[in-house]
Amino acid sequence: MKTYKEKMLILLVEKYRKSKKDSGTNVICRRTSISPVELYKKYNKNDGDLEEIEAVNQAAEACSRDGFLTFENNGFSSEIAKIYLVDEKVEEIEAYLESACGYESKSRKRQYVEQMIARYSGISPAADRECERLKGILVQNKIPNSYLQTEEVLKALTFIEKNETPLYVREASMMIYGSSKYLEENTLESVCNLL
């Protein structure tokens, strides 16, 4: 189970990676922030568990000592109002999360997509079109939403375009994925749209 420290850092990094700051198209310079309520729903409530609230506070203080984030308190209390990411430390935070809880960083996802493009480009026309679409997304410094699903689709596209013998859908699914219903249940619609 992830600790509040890991949850806090993951929320901040994911928010940063989805922002325009990461892609370089931002116009307004705004800090990446979360509220403690995103970590523990009853943080600001009177019936909130004090141990949980204190655990969130200690996690924020530990991350602040590591230089990963800063936070603001409400007035003179120990209650945290906002938690802010230190943008310059994003790669360092991702490396920490990767070792601590197996988090997959953006650079690792990007590397995986680039390898997938290299593996499937040039095999079939439909796969080439999909690889070009993926390259366009990578140029914008973004990661395709369902890149793992896209690899399954590319695998099916290349098989179907190379195949010359008539097959039933389940036979093709067995030859591609090793499961008779995987193609039918998961990737058939996407494959048909691309063909």
Residue ranges of predicted features:
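Nucleic-acid enzyme cleavage-core boundary/entry regions
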Residues: 1-195
